[in-house]
Amino acid sequence: MATSKLKTQNVVVSLSLTLTLVLVLLTSKANSAETVSFSWNKFVPKQPNMILQGDAIVTSSGKLQLNKVDENGTPKPSSLGRALYSTPIHIWDKETGSVASFAASFNFTFYAPDTKRLADGLAFFLAPIDTKPQTHAGYLGLFNENESGDQVVAVEFDTFRNSWDPPNPHIGINVNSIRSIKTTSWDLANNKVAKVLITYDASTSLLVASLVYPSQRTSNILSDVVDLKTSLPEWVRIGFSAATGLDIPGESHDVLSWSFASNLPHASSNIDPLDLTSFVLHEAI
């Protein structure tokens, strides 16, 4: 147990240091690259630079609440909410062939009144700039049932087993389909703060997602190769989407903070600020 606790503490420290380093590197290349960055430690009603869709609201306490709840805080069935950063992100450039590296960090909680009846989950995603809410429940508001023409790259935190899912709650990487290309088990904790770091290294096309529960001393990590040029348009929006169950409340989803930075190098720049990120993340475990 002592070893497990120490490893988790090391993960938390390493992820925090990694995010700080990544954000500094990404935002220091303004003269040689196209950069976008922001950091919100909490939210405010009528949050600037945010587009809310569906049931999403910002509460008076500063939480981004993605799903409807009743006066007692119990989640309501068939709720779908999304929140987008309003500024489009130039994720790759057709003229130069360059692809952006990025880092996203956020804290979130989910609350389920009955942990034996969970549904459906939350996702961080990149999608076309005109993206609209899609099918709710198991499709998490990201995909249509026929999945025709969907251009979405997402990291999902999925609590309900649909026909295309593994048997347990999981973290998945999704590329233009609700069927994840790779998953790992999610040691979820009800109503506890989860710290998430998602990075994309353009030099290797490696997408890495990690989740840590500091209070529970547990962590999960997942990675796979994703080609953003073949999966997404040149310009995208980023954001969150979360859904409750069709016939059961399942769980509500709240985002507590959110930071993001991206770097699209020009053709003359051969410096990739994330070339060590995946190594640091893997070495932290």
From Swiss-Prot:
Residues with attached carbohydrate: 107
InterPro entries reported for this sequence: ConA-like_dom_sf, L-lectin, Lectin_LegA_CS, Lectin_legB_Mn/Ca_BS, Legume_lectin_dom, Leguminous_Lectin
Signal peptide range: 1-32
UniProt entry keywords in alphabetical sequence: Glycoprotein, Lectin, Signal
UniProt xrefs under Gene3D superfamilies: 2.60.120.200
Keyword Signal: yes
KW Secreted (keyword) present: no
Function: Binds GalNAc and galactose.
Quaternary data: Homotetramer.
PANTHER family the record matches: CONCANAVALIN A-LIKE LECTIN FAMILY PROTEIN (PTHR32401), LECTIN (PTHR32401:SF45)
Family assignment from sequence similarity: Belongs to the leguminous lectin family.
Protein name per Swiss-Prot or TrEMBL: Lectin
Gene this chain is encoded by: LE1
